[in-house]
Amino acid sequence: KNKKANYPFWIRNCIEYINQNLHKNLSLLDISNELQMNPAYISNQFKKIVGISLRDYINKRKVEEAKFLIQCTNVSLLEISTTLSFADQSHFSKVFKKYTDISPNQYKNKLKK
C-alpha cells in the first residue's frame, strides 16, 4: 500500500501539505498557491495519479483524523467538526457517513461497546 513513494515529488508535497493542514478549510486554490502550480493541472493530475479527486482525498483524510480523535480523545463531535473546519456539524456528519457508512455518533457508540 506504500504507493506514495512512487508518486511524483509535487504529489508527495501536496499530500504532506494536506496532512499538515487538516484543521484548515483547504481549497484547490490554497494548494495551488502553496505548490505554485496551476490549479487545473493539480486537480486533473492528482485524480489521474492518486485515483481519487483532491476533494475526496482531503475529506477522506479529515474523516480518518476525526475517527482518530473520536477513538483517542474525549473531544465532542461538535469540537471535532470545528477543529477540522467543516462548515457545520451536519456537513461533518454527511461527509463522515459518506466514507464510513455510519454517522460520527454511531461510530462513537460502536466504540463504547
Language model regions located:
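Aromatic-anchored, glycine/proline-accented short structural segments
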Residues: 27-39
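Terminal helix-turn-helix DNA-binding modules in bacterial transcription factors
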Residues: 15-16, 20, 25, 29, ...
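An amphipathic alpha-helical interaction segment
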Residues: 1-16, 37-43
